[in-house]
Curated annotation (Swiss-Prot):
Protein name: Major outer membrane porin, serovar F
Gene name as annotated: ompA
Keywords recorded for this protein, A-Z: Cell outer membrane, Cell shape, Disulfide bond, Ion transport, Membrane, Porin, Signal, Transmembrane, Transmembrane beta strand, Transport
Function: In elementary bodies (EBs, the infectious stage, which is able to survive outside the host cell) provides the structural integrity of the outer envelope through disulfide cross-links with the small cysteine-rich protein and the large cysteine-rich periplasmic protein. It has been described in publications as the Sarkosyl-insoluble COMC (Chlamydia outer membrane complex), and serves as the functional equivalent of peptidoglycan.
Superkingdom to which the source organism belongs: Bacteria
Organism for this UniProt entry: Chlamydia trachomatis
Topological relation to the membrane, as annotated: Multi-pass membrane protein
Amino acid sequence: MKKLLKSVLVFAALSSASSLQALPVGNPAEPSLMIDGILWEGFGGDPCDPCTTWCDAISMRMGYYGDFVFDRVLKTDVNKEFEMGEALAGASGNTTSTLSKLVERTNPAYGKHMQDAEMFTNAACMTLNIWDRFDVFCTLGATSGYLKGNSASFNLVGLFGDGVNATKPAADSIPNVQLNQSVVELYTDTTFAWSVGARAALWECGCATLGASFQYAQSKPKIEELNVLCNAAEFTINKPKGYVGKEFPLDLTAGTDAATGTKDASIDYHEWQASLSLSYRLNMFTPYIGVKWSRASFDSDTIRIAQPRLVTPVVDITTLNPTIAGCGSVAGANTEGQISDTMQIVSLQLNKMKSRKSCGIAVGTTIVDADKYAVTVETRLIDERAAHVNAQFRF
């Protein structure tokens, strides 16, 4: 049985090196791996000994914490219905639908899967150890992220087929077209991130250790850059701003330098995780394997961001959006429908996202030197593809 356990854990640890802010699971034996300190010798007393004090039971560790998520499995968390303008109507010419009427339509963002979600965290880790069995720890550092998804996930919409004889839509016009065949990506800035957690070695038998942990993490990075890759309306915004809690129609100044009532776009990230893992010590190496259950949310207050455009038209245009039918107007130049052939008042919203899968596995190994220093390498699969590095020492 011992040989089988050794083989499974060693294979898991070696496999973790070849595959690749979420939260790491960590080694369940970590509270008892470093039993000596660089400044003070370790104490292995009995907690039931009346002569033992809390000073003998407590020790401190510090080190580097690096967590690198290459693909977090996320989906949107939105309603099934989405309010926007009436769908296009009419076999030819400009649309016959009412441009100022707000209706409920099927939400293309409902249950949509994100194509890519990355998060990179570098932090300092501080751990309070009790009786070489329990760890209470926190991390303080910085994180940055990247998100990419189909434009349907972000409710990218625009106005098309407007028959008004003008260079810009009316103030009460509402987007009537869903632009779902495009890509939206965003980059966040590097911002402060923190996490807290606890880990306990629940059961030990020889060199094997069964442990459990619980962690919570939080960060709120701002959007540094937003890219919309759409043939009908392609644009990039640095440090985007938008409207929170505002329904259609947006102000005609939306997307211009004259816009008011906007706020910086940011992502409020929260995650909590519980895990159970098993390790086996082999001299300097302690491989482990674990299972985890976690829930993460990315909330941007459903902020709506408008395409950048000019306040006043220049050569009768406010954006560089291309024509759809190949001419400036479906109805012809200088007649009704001057702007009907280009996408107008384009905007998108940053929908709330959450974990698509709750369960995952983690495999890794810890290398201990002189019972004072340790380096842990871990990878996580199923609900995310991530790698974790932790280097620490005991005082």
